Amino acid sequence: MILSPRRTVALGVATVLAGVGIASAAGSPSLSAEALSGYLSSHAGSAKAATGTPKVPAATPKADCGPGSHPEGAVQGRVPLADYATGRAVKGYTCNSGAVGHIGSTGGFKTFRYTDRTGRVCAFYDGTLLFPTSLAHDNEAPGVHVLDMSDPARPVQTARLVTPAMDSPHESLALNPLRGLLAAGMGSPATAPGVVDIYDVSQDCRHPVLQSTTPLGILGHESGFSPDGRTLWISTTAGPGVTAIDVSNPVLPSIVWHSFNYTFHGMNLNADGTRLYGADLGSSPGLTILDVSQVQKRDANPVVTQISHLTWPEVSIPQNTIPVTIKGHKYLVEFDEYSKGTSTSPSSAVGAARMINIDNEKKPFVTGNMRLQVNQPAARATDESKDPGAAYPVQGYAAHYCGVPRTVDPTIVACSFIVSGLRVFNIADPYHPREVAYFNMPAPNTLPLKSGAYAMSAPSFDVKNHSVWYADGDSGFWNVRLMNGAWPKGL
């Protein structure tokens, strides 16, 4: 079923900005021309490699694969060209994991699990990697796919959302489970008018109900909900710009704050919505923590202030953050996308993922890392650039998104590592993460550009069934069960 035919939104950015106060609070420097060029060129495939050997952390210890596994070869995360020649790659690679359910042949950047007020369980995932260029790449229609997951082994598509933002949400698809709101801000190429669509999924998640379509995002790309579901934050990577939208009434949303002082990729908020953890793409890429309490309280003329900023030597393109608490201590799971330069050069550092302690929010620090052997300069100096998907500028051996089963003592984190598939790490000790499972189903080269795995989406979790849900841009939606002790006891 196709919901709400595609339509043109006539209101322009000037209309949105009319009467809206533009904040001028001090914050991270605006995105420099060099940084913007680097970011856009990395997506377009023309970034120049760095020189020298970058300083990177050690690879995370490999998973110990138990019975029923079909493990990789010697290099953690690699699917070599030879495996395609022998037919090994088409069988997939599993370690302490197995496929429970599968549907579709394409995927995007976000995957969500949701239980509505009647107890129905649904999945939502976007299927548009980059509109309109992905139309030639995919053999499925774009938009946000809605699945009935009553039987996790047999997903059933019940709707496809194709309103403007849902047709091309890029990385902005967001779900607030408390209120049952599904939203997106239209994004990319670089990065589209920020048309915002809001749906109510609380009554029957199989059939979302459109609440509004407005141009309030100004420019889109990424997003984040406050935990109470009253504020939708939209960010753009086409220069600085962050917008806070009041969605208390999703039929009549309104801008409550906007600033050109920050250039964020993704962002997340703490439990009370007063702290924003931004993946900063400014002149010093990394993490920026903002005090947004006045926005959350709906103060008149709210002021947002910067609390701290952190970067790390191997930073590439900071993607997003997840606030978690582990044994009473506060951390962020932070993940970078791609590499700092070209997809394959050993001189271009792969950002991968990390744990950041924020007990003292004024002095955050990195405690541990999640990265694979295939991400390391030594591996990139070999012939891995010949592996299918490795040299494609917006694919490659790198990280993209992560997800956790819960925010308090999550124990594990699942991350999409693009050509290396879905990787699962134990973070019970955030100073020493270790890999415990992986699942990688490379796609055969049957369509233009389709080659290798394209695991890009933020995963979600089916805790009851010890499963992880994610979408691969080349092979669709997957429901993967963890086995052999990879799923932690007590979770």
Where are these regions (language model features)?
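Secretory targeting and sorting signals
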Residues: 2-28
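Feature marking well-ordered beta-strand scaffolds used for ligand recognition
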Residues: 29-491
